[in-house]
Amino acid sequence: MKLVMVSGRSGSGKSVVLRVLEDLGYYCVDNLPLPLMDTLLEQLKGSTDLVAISVDVRNMPEQDKEFLKQLANLPKGTELLSFFLDSSDEVLLKRYSETRRLHPLSRTKTSLKEAIEHERELLEPVSKMVDHYIDTSNLNIYDLSDKIREILLGSVDKELVINFESFGFKYGMPVEADFMFDVRFLPNPHWEPELRPMTGLDEPVQLFLSQQPTVNKFIWQIENLLATWLPHLERNNRSYLTIAIGCTGGQHRSVYVTEQLAKLFANSKHKIQARHRELSDD
């Protein structure tokens, strides 16, 4: 089992790292008390090989030796990788002032500045025990995400799942769509009596639509649009991209166009999915 432990000062980006780890398939637990770590790993044994926990100052042992002892007593076969995130006092003060969140060490008579300084003193020994110390003072969330991926995977590439989905406007638009294309202006097989009972998955319908210049041109234009902007969407650290294609009933045109786009991108580095909402119960 691989265990990633994320510690560090409050406001330095631990939650960002946990989100990255979750995207990479890790089972993540936020603010886990270290004495419960053995129990957690035992419970997860056999169900997952990737576990990540974050630990804040309230859950850290007061003595350095106790901290090392708990890490040394991990279950046999556990591969530990540890991160410590830090930022300058000035940056942390600015971040907390902007978000107006309460610092974990804030007390009625303790100022934010004092809480930040006190946490630095408490965690300084821990910062010297980890595998990777990362100063996030000058990193945005995307820079930090890329840095974590590079450490764990050896590259910053992230698998983008592209979901092409057909639908019928008469049944409502999909709320999860990132891009939506209306193909109701294209020639409609519904008006061909022999094609009406079929769908865009059937060869006669596909043949009919493939012979329509406007259909081919529109598919080509969508392909070029997506190919142009996909690199920019990847740099925005997306995990999923949903492209919705809609016609009137979601039976013919939208299904065909969705299938063609999925085939065009099938050999890309992305994971491609095709779904037909109005055919899903068939």
Swiss-Prot record:
A Pfam family: RapZ-like_N
Transmembrane segments: none
Gene Ontology molecular functions: ATP binding; GTP binding
Amino-acid positions noted as binding GTP in the UniProt annotation, renumbered to this chain: 56-59
Classification via InterPro entries: P-loop_NTPase, RapZ-like, RapZ-like_N, RapZ_C
Protein residues bound to ATP: 8-15
Keywords: ATP-binding, GTP-binding, Nucleotide-binding
Family recorded in the similarity comment: Belongs to the RapZ-like family.
Function, in words: Displays ATPase and GTPase activities.
Name of the protein in its database record: Nucleotide-binding protein in ptsN-ptsO intergenic region
